[in-house]
Amino acid sequence: MITCLRIELSKAFRNGWFAVALVIGCAFGLGCAALYAIPSVFSTFVPNPDKFYHPTSQSCFNAWISVDTTSWALLFYQVLPLLCVIPYAWSFASERKDGYISHAYTRVGRGEYFFAKYVAVFLSAGAVAVLPQILNLVTLACFFPGYVPSIQDANYYAPVFWQSVGSFLFYNLPLAYVALYMLIDFLLCGAWAGFVLALSLVVHNRVILLTAPYLALLAIQFVNENIFFAIGKVRGFQLSLFENLHGSCSMYIQNGWIIVGEIAVFLFMAGLFWVSGGKRDAL
């Protein structure tokens, strides 16, 4: 078991697709930090050295990509569910096509192989989700101090409202808020990638395997954003995976139970597929 897990982790974190996904994610992280820092430093502070600015408004936490509402930050979370499946969620489909799993089944049991594969996919997806956000915050901290945000900034700088998940932490212990959303994104992306991996038991084409679930997420987001307008007089809730990965809310405020439910559904569906997959012939 340990050897199989070590092999799968090595394959997941040392393949070129993991590097591609991570570089793209880090480019978003650095780009969003630069787009916030450069105008603030060279267009606001340098030309007006004697002007007072409310200290909390220039906190690195207010500018963190997870609470940033600029177009590039929103685009990052829009493509994140696709980025996190690129590193290794396709591996089972590829190994089945190449005949590798037949050899793997003779060396380790199917259960051990499936478990090691799932853990590798889960961890690589979580890393792709979290590392760019850490890089973004560290870069911003090089330009702006870590002031504790003020609730007065909610309407102007950081749209984290009192109903938002973890809002108390954001305005009291911002590092704990960062850790909370890192954990949420790690679990959501890991569970999502594991679900896509499980779909490879019935979807053999790797391009369809990675793109079809993503298109389904876009469809769910479209329905979620429009159905409450169509119904009228109904308080909306956030079902979109894209929006639940993002700390700040755009249309509907996140609900912690819905986020937990999404993680549970992805894990449950992946478990069903793996149980059924264990009964199938390797060929």
Residue ranges of model-derived segments:
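Aromatic- and glycine-rich beta-strand/loop motifs that create alpha-glucan
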Residues: 1-26
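Membrane-helix interface segments
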Residues: 16-17, 109-111, 115, 205-210
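Hydrophobic core positions of alpha-helical segments in small-molecule transporters
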Residues: 20-24, 115-116, 128, 212-213, ...
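Central hydrophobic cores of alpha-helical transmembrane segments
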Residues: 21-26, 206-220
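Secretory targeting signals
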Residues: 27-93, 119-197, 201, 237-261
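Membrane-interfacial segments
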Residues: 39-44, 93-96, 100, 139, ...
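Helix-loop-helix units of permease transmembrane domains in multi-pass membrane transporters
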Residues: 91-124
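Junction motif at the cytosolic side of a transmembrane helix
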Residues: 198, 202, 261-283
